[in-house]
From Swiss-Prot:
Top-level taxon of origin: Eukaryota
Biased composition (Low complexity): 7-19, 236-251, 282-296, 334-345
Compositionally biased intervals (Polar residues): 252-261, 271-281
Record-linked InterPro entries: FAM217
Name of the gene this protein is made from: Fam217a
Annotated segments matching region Disordered: 1-60, 96-119, 236-299, 317-382
PANTHER family (UniProt xref): PROTEIN FAM217A, SI:CH211-266K22.6
Family of this protein: Belongs to the FAM217 family.
UniProt-recorded name of the protein: Protein FAM217A
Length: 419
């Protein structure tokens, strides 16, 4: 035991005398030895089937050395992490190798990227570099504005260049263009073939120009007149709009109405012998006046065209020629008001009684001049007539009940009621 303790002390002193420079290498070697022994021991344990490891028991000094190196390595790692960060001394040679490998790989990648460029891109780069080197001084030429005097008189005709040579430039092309034959040849000497073709072409152009002018002239006139009409149709003020908005006048209805009223007046004079009392006539005038008002309103709504007036006149004639049927109401006495219309005249002509064979002298009847007074009287009489109807209705019902055989048998009705 004393020998073993001396060996362990000497080994510990030997470890403490190791310099700090070789400390990292020693740590790496110790770790490698430790790993190899662990693997070796695991293999021996698997082969022996659970036998004890004799090497660990035989060499306790090596175990102590390994423990000391591991503890020192942990202590140095904690100090380096606190002072310098994550950098570790024991792994420094490995990190240096990795950084060198990374640099080499980045250089290779750059080379491959340059080689991946296509030929077109390389050509474009070369062209851009070529154009950048070019220095072009492009400047516009300066034009000098020189004002030259141009003598022009007020009555002078502008001179144009002659298309034809001297003997032919005096030809009146407009006059010769519409000649039936080639009279221009007689006016001048016969020209050469080329000049003759040029003269013929100029004459043809003159002819075409004249035809186009004649064709476009009516179009210009039509457009001018249409614009003038459009300007005239526009109302100049609000008064013109008001006059257009007014209802159109009825030109021929008044003449038709007057003629119809006169004819009806003659008929009524002939048939006045079979007239009724004045009260019934006033009733008839009131009802006919109401009808005439409604018909006049309907007539005013209609348009006053000549065709419609002609149709109305034909209807009036047909109604006069038709057979006259008697009506329940008496004929109408003519009034001073001009409210008689065409439909009213038609109704009167249909409702007149047949003519009597014996001539009867007319009976003059007096009517109020104001139509308002005329309308007031029959209204009151109408009301009285209605009251009399209501009063007589009860007696009529009683009389009808008395005529029934059942009531007569019972003796409820008096003999006077039965009569």
């Amino acid at each position: 035991m004393g020998r073993k303790s001396n060996e362990s002390c000497s080994s510990s002193l030997h470890v403490s005398s190791i310099s700090q420079e070789n400390h990292s290498q020693w740590n790496l070697d110790a770790e490698e030895l430790f790993d190899e022994k662990e693997t070796f021991s695991s293999e021996n344990d698997g082969a022996a089937g659970g036998k004890t490891n004799k090497s660990h028991l035989e060499n306790p000094a090596e175990q102590l050395i390994l423990q000391l190196t591991v503890s020192e390595h942990a202590h140095s790692r904690s100090q380096q992490n606190s002072s310098q960060g994550v950098f570790q001394l024991w792994s420094s040679p490995v990190n240096k190798g990795s950084t060198v490998d990374k640099r080499n790989s980045s250089v290779e990648e750059n080379v491959t990227d340059e080689s991946d460029l296509s030929e077109n891109e390389k050509m474009n780069d070369s062209l851009l570099s070529y154009f950048k080197k070019m220095d072009l001084n492009l400047k516009p030429e300066t034009i000098e504005h020189v004002e030259r005097p141009f003598p022009e008189e007020a009555g002078q005709v502008p001179v144009y260049a002659d298309f034809l040579p001297a003997p032919f430039n005096t030809l009146d092309l407009h006059r010769f263009a519409f000649s039936k034959c080639e009279s221009w040849k007689a006016a001048v000497e016969p020209p050469e073939s080329s000049i003759e073709r040029l003269i013929l072409r100029l004459l043809e152009l003159e002819r075409l120009q004249h035809m186009t002018i004649q064709r476009e002239r009516p179009r210009l006139q039509s457009t001018f007149y249409s614009s003038m009409f459009s300007m005239a149709e526009r109302p100049s003020s609000s008064k013109a709009i008001a006059t257009k908005a007014k209802a159109p006048k009825i030109p021929e209805t008044s003449t038709l109405q007057t003629s119809g009223v006169d004819k009806n007046r003659d008929k009524r004079k002939n048939n006045s012998g079979s007239g009724k009392p004045e009260q019934n006539v006033s009733k008839w005038s009131l009802s006919s006046a109401g009808k005439s008002k409604s018909n006049s309103r309907a007539l005013l709504k209609c348009s006053s065209t000549s065709k419609q007036c002609a149709v109305a006149h034909d209807d009036l004639k047909n109604s006069k020629n038709s057979s006259l049927n008697p009506c329940q109401e008496p004929p109408l006495k003519p009034t001073t008001t001009t409210q008689a219309t065409q439909p009213m005249a038609r109704v009167v002509s249909r409702c007149l009684p047949p003519r009597s064979p014996m001539p009867v002298s007319p009976i003059p009847l007096s009517f109020p001049e104001n139509p308002r007074e005329e309308g007031k009287v029959p209204r009151t009489k109408k009301k009285c007539h209605r009251k009399s109807i209501l009063l007589n209705r009860a007696f009529y019902i009683q009389k009808r009940n008395c005529l029934s055989p059942s009531l007569i048998a019972r003796g409820k009705c008096s003999p006077t009621d039965q009569k």
